[in-house]
Structures are given as C-alpha cells and as structure tokens.
C-alpha cells in the first residue's frame, strides 16, 4: 500500500462528495500503480456502501481510443457504478450537479449469471445475454496531470450510466457503429447535430474479452459480476457537458439512448 494511502483516500473521498473540493497538490505529487489505485478505489466503494448506497455495476477502463494501455500493455482497470446513478433513457440531469466532464456513448451489458475468476470471452458472452445503448456520465474531479493510477483510484471519473432498452446482445460486435447527436437548447428541437460516428473495429477492445478481463480482475479484488448488474466496456464518441439533449444511436438493432442536461 502507498505510504500516503490514508490521506489519499480521504482526499479522493472528499472529491467524490464535492468535486470542487480543494485537494491541494497531493494528487499531482502521487504516483500510483494500477493495483495501488485499484485498492484505493475499492475502499472508496466501501465508504459509499457504508453510507447506504448500493453497488449497481461496473466499468472496464482504458479499452478504447487514446486511453488504451495508459497503465501498460493489456492493463485494464475497473470502476464501480452506484445503483442510484443507473438511470433510464430520457433522464434529465441538472447540468450544475455534474461539475466538469462529459458524456460518452458506451454499450451497456446486463449481467444474467455470475462471472468471476475463470471467465473467458465465451463464458462472458453466455453470462451477459442482453445489451443496451448507453451513456457514461464522466465527472472530472482530478486536477489535470494526475498519473493513470490516481485516475484509477478516483474511479476512472465515473459519475453514472444512462441506458436505454435492453435487447439480445449481438454475437458479433466487430462491426458495431455508434453515432452521437447533440441538440443544444437554443436549436429547434427537430434539429440535431451529429457529433461523430465511430466504428468498433480498430477503436475498442473485443467487448466479450473485456468482460472476461473485468471478471477476472474483480476476483483479484474480492468481487465478481453478479446478475442484474450493468457493465460498460469502453467509450465510442464523446462530448463535453453542455445544456441540451444528447442522443446515441447504436446499429445492429441495439437502438437509441437519450439524456438531457438541463439548466
């Protein structure tokens, strides 16, 4: 465990409760490994649970785009999602509640059966038969320049998940494509602006392999994937917070998800 672990944990906890908390320079001066950051993150989860929150699901990080391998080749840390922040499509979230951050289109899997230590891509596919179009709501609590292990300790910036209607998970997601649309409040509601479209191939790790890696890593830290948990496996298109509606469209029959940030 890192020498400053108690102080780091308290600082991270204060940021979880108030992202505008003045953390000083301890986070910028700290270098954490993936495992050190993960251990601190699990303690953050325990604090939330002790306050009466429930665990709702998980994310696996550093699987897509520029974040891949930020902690080293093949290292894929996890983050937790609070049940109170698992929100349905169409949710309206006050913009002021979120501080800094952005929305990211992510495929959201719903776990059907437990998955843990011996997970493989094949067993993961069998354990998560449903998938939904989703948004991850990311909150930037850390000062710029923190090392990747500190980002893990801060729960990989997760604030919550918005998910649409679940469908049978396609067996082959290699040609999944996701388009993000935005509709600022000062634009006619019938008019949307496409932010961008990203295809799975070459952008993101195999989803089912990511689920297996997540299950095995959770086992290393005393957890596993449980029925009805939501799991997100990596970002597609993203956009900074702004007032208005966002829509994500997922092909392959997965469908749409909506979230509004209100003033």
Roles of regions detected by a PLM:
Residues 224, 248-249:
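Hydrophobic, well-ordered secondary-structure scaffolds
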Residues 2-206, 212, 240-243, 247, ...:
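Catalytic-core "active-site belt" of small-molecule-metabolizing enzymes
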Residues 207-243:
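A conserved acidic, glycine/proline-rich C-terminal tail/linker
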């Amino acid at each position: 465990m890192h020498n400053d672990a108690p102080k780091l944990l308290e600082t991270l906890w204060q940021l979880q409760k108030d992202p505008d908390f003045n953390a000083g320079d301890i986070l910028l001066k700290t270098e954490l490994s993936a495992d050190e950051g993960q251990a601190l993150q699990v303690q953050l989860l325990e604090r939330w649970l002790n306050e009466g929150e429930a665990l709702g699901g998980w994310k696996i990080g550093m699987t897509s785009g520029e974040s891949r391998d930020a902690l080293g080749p093949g290292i894929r840390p996890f983050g937790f999602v609070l049940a109170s922040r698992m929100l349905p499509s169409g949710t309206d979230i006050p913009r002021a509640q979120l501080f800094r951050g952005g929305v990211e289109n992510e495929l959201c899997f719903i776990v059907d059966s437990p998955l843990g230590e011996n997970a493989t891509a094949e067993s993961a596919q069998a354990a998560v038969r449903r998938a939904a179009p989703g948004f991850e709501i990311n909150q930037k609590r850390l000062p710029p320049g923190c090392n990747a292990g500190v980002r893990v300790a801060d729960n990989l910036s997760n604030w919550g998940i918005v998910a649409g209607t679940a469908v049978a998970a396609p067996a082959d997601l290699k040609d999944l494509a996701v388009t993000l649309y935005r509709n600022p409040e000062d634009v006619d509601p019938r008019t949307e602006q496409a932010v961008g479209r990203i295809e799975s191939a070459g952008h993101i790790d195999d989803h089912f392999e990511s689920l297996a890696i997540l299950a095995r890593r959770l086992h290393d830290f005393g957890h596993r994937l449980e029925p009805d948990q939501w799991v997100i496996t990596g970002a597609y298109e993203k956009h900074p917070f702004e007032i208005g509606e966002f829509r994500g469209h997922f092909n392959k029959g997965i469908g749409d998800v909506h979230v509004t940030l209100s003033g």
